[in-house]
Structure formats: structure tokens, C-alpha cells
Regions:
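Residue-level signature of catalytic and energy-coupling elements of molecular machines
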Residues: 30, 65, 87, 157
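Short Gly/Thr/Asp-enriched flexible loops that form oxyanion-binding sites at enzyme active sites
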Residues: 74-85
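Conserved acidic residues
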Residues: 63, 125, 155
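Active-site-facing substrate-recognition patch
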Residues: 2-62
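PRPP-dependent phosphoribosyltransferase catalytic core
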Residues: 2-8, 12, 18, 141-185
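Conserved G/P- and acidic residue-centered "switch" motifs that form tight phosphate/ATP-binding loops
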Residues: 132, 137
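Short, glycine/charge-rich flexible loops or terminal/linker lids adjacent to PRPP-binding catalytic cores
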Residues: 85-128
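Short glycine-rich phosphate-binding loop at a beta-alpha junction
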Residues: 62-69
Length: 185
């Protein structure tokens, strides 16, 4: 599974890459950071991005879009609006006011936790996960497992940027993955 950007979205990928600033040695030496804030401020680029993410899932009858803190909160609501779906935030621990379901997952050096309201998803609802970046696949996998623990059916995952050289799809083989932009370094 997993689809590269295709059709109309693919035709616009080069334009979107031109709008992303590359920042070397951020957040630490040896890391090349892809700064999307320059894309966000471009109204045509931002609209193209939201349209392309939405169009990939438009025929899937999505009930909810799950946005992962923090940049998933930028794209998720706009995609949800386009899909006539609800939006659910997936947050860091202690940020949601009502009862939550949590999922702990391993990082290279330690662990992290994601939370969602316990009543955010009804059993059988079709959801997509939207975030800015697919790097190692750990956060996406944790978000999917968290949603599935509440009875969600994961219809797919949509990302703005995918770091192909980290091979993130190996953790996510059972999911339909759509990434607009691919980087090999």
C-alpha cells in the first residue's frame, strides 16, 4: 500500500518544494531541517497543499481527520473541512481537559506519549491521520494504534513531507500513505 503523489497533486509538487526553506544544522548539527513556514505564508501554495491532501481522500467517506500536535493542527482542520469531516486533535500528555486514552511509544532515546479524548472516536468510524512530516513513522504508527484502540478504521495517512531516506513506510505497511513531497536527504 501507500501511494506517491499523483495526478494534479504531483504536478504541483515542484512548486511546493520551492516554497520550503532548507535550514542546515537545525535543530542540531548535521540535521537538514525542512521549514514549512515559508510554504504556509504563500496563499497559493497553502491552498494547493490542502487541495491535494483532501483530493487524495475525497472518495473515501472519511468521518474524522486526526491531526497530530502541533503541525497536524495546521493542516488537519482545513482537510477536515474539505472532506466534510470532523477534526480530532491528538496531543501531548496533559493537554486535553476530559478523560483520555493514551499510547506510549519508543523513540530512539526514550519514550513519548500521545493522548486523545476517550470519546473522540466511535467504533467503526473511518479516519485519516494528517501531519506535516513522515520521518521514521513512529508518531504515525502510535497515532494509528491509539485511534484503533478506540475502534477507528484507519482509511489512510496524509503528509506534506516524507523523508524517504529514513524508510518510514516499513512501520506502516498496512496503511494507505499519501505524501505530497519526498526528500532523499
Amino acid at each position: 500500500m501507500g501511494n506517491p503523489a499523483s495526478g494534479k497533486a504531483s504536478a504541483n509538487c515542484d512548486h511546493l518544494k520551492e516554497l520550503i526553506r532548507e535550514v542546515p544544522d537545525f535543530p542540531k548539527k548535521g540535521i537538514l531541517f525542512y521549514d514549512i513556514t515559508t510554504l504556509l505564508k504563500d496563499k497559493t501554495g497553502f491552498a494547493t497543499l490542502i487541495d491535494a491532501l483532501s483530493e487524495h481522500f475525497i472518495s473515501d467517506k472519511i468521518d474524522l481527520v486526526l491531526g497530530v500536535e502541533a503541525r497536524g493542527f495546521i493542516f488537519g482542520p482545513a482537510v477536515a473541512y474539505r472532506l466534510n469531516a470532523g477534526f480530532v486533535p491528538v496531543r501531548k500528555p496533559g493537554k486535553l481537559p476530559a478523560a483520555t486514552q493514551k499510547y506510549d511509544y519508543a523513540l530512539e532515546y526514550g519514550t513519548n506519549t500521545l493522548e486523545i479524548h476517550s470519546d473522540a472516536i466511535q467504533k467503526g468510524q473511518r479516519v485519516i491521520i494528517v501531519d506535516d512530516l513522515l520521518a521514521t513513522g513512529g508518531t504515525a504508527e502510535a497515532t494509528a494504534k491509539l485511534a484503533e484502540s478506540l475502534g477507528a478504521e484507519i482509511a489512510g495517512m496524509g503528509f506534506v513531507v516524507e523523508l524517504d531516506f529514513l524508510n518510514p513506510r516499513k512501520k506502516l505497511t498496512q496503511y494507505d500513505i499519501f505524501s505530497l513531497l519526498h526528500y532523499d536527504k
